[in-house]
């Protein structure tokens, strides 16, 4: 059998499908673009949904790709098994309404068995199929597959929600009896038993039905265009071709493991327990690619996933004896492994390393903070008379602070407490269920719209026009084409139009359709792209219209001009962000409306007030410089030579439009813009905020809206000036600072008085010293507002040699709080409070020098105080 590198496998896959007329789709960004249903791109087909649901018609219906993907619903299994990964590559071939079952199976078999390609031994291949799908069974038989190698399975039907669905046929490679120690054989496949012998290497989904959850599967309607969707895991193929026991011994992971060996001084043993090596190798791949694609560690969404991966890998580093940040040192190795197809990791290496190292250092601090949280939590439980740490708190320590359960258990044991393990496991399961639900949620491809997909009439958007005459080509009403319509809403396609269809963050034009006499026959309320790319006008009708007639199309020029100002300002803002906070601040979304703009970008922290001031100033400088805005149409290669910034996730054809603003900004953009930056007038940032982990948002206004914003601020300042009696606005800051200082002085004076009163009260308490068995003790009831005040008493007591033991009791509301502090080696505060607390119907515990408890029987306080001497 051939011995192929992962790069050779990937390239051979793409070359084979190119030979069958497929276009190679580049691997998309791991962060989904315009798809809120997905947290990550999690399969090869995830980026092609627009083709499968018919909302966009591809240039070539035959597509192949190698797609980097992330799935995180089973993070805890990574490192425990031979094949679980967070980041992996899915090789795929796809047919959008072109070839179907016969070609997909025949070509798949050719790729796998032909000496020119993969050259797998035929007797090593097994296939599963849906029992009712005899067409697939017969096709495999016709290709020479033995019936004993064809296994019917009821689970071989692919459907997730409404949308394309159908039977699938899976291909397995038999690794032999060495991987079947109990000699179970083919039953491993027949009974779907988890095993390392029969490895699934490819799944071919025959998408031929529109799934409808409201009807039985037997009543699903056939798709107007049948599709093929396949996926083969590169890591599994590499393990087979390279004779590796697990995926981790392939050229995709082993170089990373070797680097970890150097850093840790430990050795990776293929037959031993190497979970930590595997976790680190897997997680740093996912981290490197995800951060390179613009995702950043944080506390929610995909940022939370990255933070969890990094902390899990870091903890496993500690198990290998690594005490310093080290993950960032592995980024270069990841980049070197993947450079042939994914150069972006090495290109962004410095930035990725910076983020990873910063997170590692932050995690070290978090571990310290987590220890403090745990101590405070146990103090609180002791004060409340509880001795078990709730499962949700254990999970918080695990999830937020990176505390393994064993570490929490050790801390609890020192305080005489136990763990609610069942509650912890329930909280863990809830999180895993949420993760799995989010994956399922994003699976549906959506129902195909046959009517819109069938529109093939040509239509052209005419730049620079606000009104023109056009012939009406298509009317769609009630999801069906018609020749005429007179009321309600309809979708219209003209042979040409001045109306901009919503795209690239620019909202659609609004306006009117007029007849030959100048009467309005329809109001345009939206314009979107049809599946074949034509501008599709949504209109509300006020008169009858007919296909073939000529109409005048007029846009609302005021709306268009406002949108253009904001769109050009967005380009200026994007360039300013690059200049001031870094090249990593790339566009993650935008919205250019008539009266404001919204710009989302990748950044790992809040933009400072000083940075915002500089950004605003730089954008306005470009506006005041009155720079011409020039748009040229050219080919994509020339555009790249011009230095045009392409937005990741946007699909560009061979011909593109390049918008240049002097030498300040050059971007690929299909939108409309002002002719000169001076038309924008003025630019003002209203708000900067985080909208998700690693993503920031700026909301800004231009022109008249910016003037109104400044005026509102001036009015507010005048109101403040009047309130504080400052006749000159310029004196307001000094006057406010003077008032603030007065408040600080009063607060300081108040705190001093409270401290003096507390000291006086403590002095009275500390005077009442008694003796029991040679141990000096103070036992007293005090009047305080909260349990924290008891600790303040104890802190004051520690400063001087008042006594050996201090026992304080306070009735706060309907609860009794007890504190025991000890300086004596003969008295353990935690043990003493366990004896005293039950007297007031409470429980507690703590350290040898300090312990707290909580109770509910205030009537027994004096009894508790009287019993102190008997227990010393």
Curated annotation (Swiss-Prot):
Cellular component, GO annotation: cytosol
Pfam family for this entry, one: DHHA1
Keywords, in A-Z order: Aminoacyl-tRNA synthetase, ATP-binding, Cytoplasm, Ligase, Metal-binding, Nucleotide-binding, Protein biosynthesis, RNA-binding, tRNA-binding, Zinc
A GO MF term: alanine-tRNA ligase activity
Chief location bin: cytoplasm
Cofactor binding remark: Binds 1 zinc ion per subunit.
Catalytic activity as recorded in UniProt: tRNA(Ala) + L-alanine + ATP = L-alanyl-tRNA(Ala) + AMP + diphosphate
Cofactor dependence: Zn(2+)
E.C. number: 6.1.1.7
Binding site for Zn(2+): 567, 571, 669, 673
Top-level EC class: ligase
Domain notes: Consists of three domains; the N-terminal catalytic domain, the editing domain and the C-terminal C-Ala domain. The editing domain removes incorrectly charged amino acids, while the C-Ala domain, along with tRNA(Ala), serves as a bridge to cooperatively bring together the editing and aminoacylation centers thus stimulating deacylation of misacylated tRNAs.
Sequence similarity: Belongs to the class-II aminoacyl-tRNA synthetase family.
PANTHER family to which the protein is assigned, alphabetical: ALANINE--TRNA LIGASE, CYTOPLASMIC (PTHR11777:SF9), ALANYL-TRNA SYNTHETASE (PTHR11777)
Record function comment: Catalyzes the attachment of alanine to tRNA(Ala) in a two-step reaction: alanine is first activated by ATP to form Ala-AMP and then transferred to the acceptor end of tRNA(Ala). Also edits incorrectly charged Ser-tRNA(Ala) and Gly-tRNA(Ala) via its editing domain.
Protein name: Alanine--tRNA ligase
Annotated source species: Streptococcus suis (strain 05ZYH33)
């Amino acid at each position: 059998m051939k011995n192929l590198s992962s790069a050779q496998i990937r390239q051979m896959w793409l070359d084979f499908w190119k030979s069958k007329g497929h276009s190679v789709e580049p691997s998309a960004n791991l962060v989904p673009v315009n798809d809120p249903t997905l947290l990550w791109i999690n399969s090869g087909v995830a980026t092609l949904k627009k083709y499968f649901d018919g909302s966009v018609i591809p240039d070539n219906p035959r597509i192949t790709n190698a797609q980097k993907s992330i799935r995180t619903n089973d993070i805890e299994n990574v490192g425990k098994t031979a094949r679980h990964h967070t980041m992996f590559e899915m090789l795929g071939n796809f047919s959008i309404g072109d070839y179907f079952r016969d070609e997909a199976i025949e070509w798949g078999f050719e790729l796998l068995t032909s000496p020119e390609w993969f050259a797998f031994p035929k007797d090593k291949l097994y296939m599963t199929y849906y029992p009712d799908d005899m067409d697939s069974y017969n096709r495999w038989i016709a290709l020479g597959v033995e019936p004993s190698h064809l296994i019917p399975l009821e689970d071989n039907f692919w459907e997730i929600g409404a949308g394309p669905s159908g039977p699938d046929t899976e291909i397995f490679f038999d690794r032999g009896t060495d991987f079947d120690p109990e000699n179970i054989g083919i039953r491993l496949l027949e009974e779907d038993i988890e095993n390392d012998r029969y490895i699934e290497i490819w799944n071919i989904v025959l998408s031929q039905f529109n799934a409808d959850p409201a009807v039985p599967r037997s009543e699903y309607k056939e798709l107007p265009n049948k599709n093929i969707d396949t996926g083969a895991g590169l890591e599994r193929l590499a393990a087979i071709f390279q004779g590796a026991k697990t995926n981790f011994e392939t050229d995709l992971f082993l170089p990373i493991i070797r680097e970890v060996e150097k850093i840790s001084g430990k050795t990776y043993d293929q037959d031993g327990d190497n979970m930590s090596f595997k976790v680190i190798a897997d997680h740093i791949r996912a981290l490197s690619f995800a951060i390179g694609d613009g995702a950043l560690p944080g506390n929610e969404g995909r940022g939370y996933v990255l933070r969890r991966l990094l902390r899990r890998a870091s903890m496993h580093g500690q198990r290998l004896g690594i005490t310093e940040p080290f993950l960032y040192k592995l980024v270069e190795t990841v980049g070197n492994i993947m450079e042939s197809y994914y150069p972006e990791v090495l290109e962004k290496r410095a930035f990725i390393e910076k983020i990873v190292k910063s997170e590692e250092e932050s995690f070290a601090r978090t571990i310290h903070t987590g220890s403090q949280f745990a101590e405070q939590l146990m103090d609180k439980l002791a004060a409340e008379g509880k001795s078990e740490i709730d499962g949700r708190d254990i999970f918080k320590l695990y999830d937020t602070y990176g505390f393994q359960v064993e570490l929490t258990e050790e801390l609890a044991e020192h305080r005489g407490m136990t763990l609610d393990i069942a509650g912890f496991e329930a909280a863990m399961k809830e999180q895993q269920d949420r993760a799995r639900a989010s994956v399922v949620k994003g699976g549906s491809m959506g129902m195909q719209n046959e009517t819109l997909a069938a529109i093939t009439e040509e239509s052209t958007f005419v730049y620079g026009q606000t009104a023109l005459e056009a012939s009406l080509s298509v009317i769609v009403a009630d999801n069906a084409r018609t020749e005429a319509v007179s009321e309600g809403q309809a979708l219209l396609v003209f042979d040409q139009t001045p109306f901009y269809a919503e795209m690239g963050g620019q909202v659609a034009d609004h306006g009117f359709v007029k007849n030959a006499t100048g009467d309005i026959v329809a109001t345009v309320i939206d314009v979107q792209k049809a599946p074949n790319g034509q501008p599709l006008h949504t209109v509300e009708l006020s008169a009858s219209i007919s296909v073939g007639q000529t109409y005048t199309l007029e846009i609302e020029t005021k709306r268009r001009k406002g949108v253009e100002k904001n769109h050009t300002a967005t380009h200026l803002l994007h360039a300013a962000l690059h200049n001031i906070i870094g090249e990593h601040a790339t566009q993650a979304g935008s919205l250019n409306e008539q009266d404001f703009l919204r710009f989302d970008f990748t950044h790992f922290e809040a933009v400072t007030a000083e940075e915002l001031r500089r950004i605003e100033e730089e954008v306005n400088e470009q506006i005041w410089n009155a720079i011409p805005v020039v748009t040229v149409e050219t080919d994509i290669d020339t555009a790249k030579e011009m230095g045009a910034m392409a937005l990741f996730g946007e699909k560009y054809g061979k011909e593109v439009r390049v918008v240049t603003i002097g030498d300040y900004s050059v971007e690929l953009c299909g939108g409309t813009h002002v002719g000169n930056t001076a038309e924008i007038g003025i630019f003002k940032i209203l708000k900067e905020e985080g909208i998700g982990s690693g993503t920031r948002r700026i909301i800004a206004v231009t022109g008249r809206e910016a003037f109104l914003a400044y005026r509102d601020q001036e009015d507010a300042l005048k109101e403040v000036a009047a309130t504080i009696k400052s006749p000159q606005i310029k004196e307001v800051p000094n006057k406010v600072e003077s008032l603030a200082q007065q408040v600080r002085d009063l607060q300081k004076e108040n705190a001093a008085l409270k401290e003096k009163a507390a000291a006086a009260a403590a002095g009275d308490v500390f005077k009442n010293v008694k003796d029991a068995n040679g141990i000096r003790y103070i036992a007293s009831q005090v009047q305080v507002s909260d349990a924290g005040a008891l600790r303040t008493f104890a802190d004051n007591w520690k400063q001087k040699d008042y006594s050996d033991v201090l026992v304080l009791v306070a009735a706060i509301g309907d609860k009794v709080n007890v504190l025991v502090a000890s300086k004596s080696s003969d008295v353990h505060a935690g043990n003493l409070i366990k004896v005293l607390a039950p007297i007031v119907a409470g429980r507690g515990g703590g350290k040898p020098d300090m312990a707290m408890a909580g109770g509910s029987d205030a009537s027994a306080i004096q009894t508790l105080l009287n019993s102190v001497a008997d227990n010393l």
